[in-house]
From Swiss-Prot:
A GO MF label: carbohydrate binding
Protein name stated in the entry: Lectin
Coiled-coil residues: none
Source species taxonomy: Eukaryota, Viridiplantae, Streptophyta, Embryophyta, Tracheophyta
Keyword entries, A-Z: Lectin
């Protein structure tokens, strides 16, 4: 369960990074 949560958090972070990269 913790691994899933970690993966989900990493996924969200990756998504935010993509949005930031696309913004610049």
């Amino acid at each position: 369960l913790e691994e899933q949560s970690f993966s989900f958090t990493k996924f969200s972070t990756d998504q935010q990074n993509l949005i930031l990269q696309a913004h610049y």
